[in-house]
Amino acid sequence: QPENKPTETTPEPEPEPEPSEDAGDVYEAIRLINAERAKAGLAELTIDDDLMSMAAVRAAELPEKFDHTRPDGSDWKTVFGEFGVEVPYKRGENAGLGKDTASKQVNSWMNSSGHKANILKDNVTKIGVGYCYGDGAEKKNYWIMIVTN
């Protein structure tokens, strides 16, 4: 009978750091965005399932191309067609990078005039927020907010 000798094992690699527990809390981001709108006397935005799905798609694209242009070179608005939705007349997209919590990301957007303007648009009623933790060479937090009428 063969002897039961222990064999050498390759040590397990150290696990990569995971995002913080509240990272990517898209509903907290929406709550904070609506709080900023309330402070400005604007109506609350309602969560739209299609916009949530579109935002998830766009957030997942950001590690490949952090831009309002999609990885295939098309404009960000082409995501509407993928969901059978006509591009709304009133719309806006905010992209964010590196913030590990909803609070940090919304604060960052509120401290940027263009992003703040999208949050405080008075002619939009719906919102979707997406988040992606990029696990490529650069581990980063990616956020997308889409608002429409």
Predicted regions mapped to residue ranges:
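Ser/Thr/Gly/Pro-rich low-complexity, disordered linker/stalk segments of secreted
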Residues: Q1-S20
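A short alpha-helix/helix-coil micro-patch that ends at or immediately precedes a cysteine
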Residues: P19-K65
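Short, functionally important structural connectors and interaction interfaces within domains
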Residues: R37-K39, A43, V87, N111, ...
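Surface-exposed patches in mature extracellular/periplasmic domains of secreted proteins
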Residues: K39-S53, F66-K77, K116-C132
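Short, surface-exposed glycine/acidic/tryptophan-bearing loops
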Residues: S53-D100
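Disulfide-stabilized extracellular recognition modules
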Residues: G96-N149
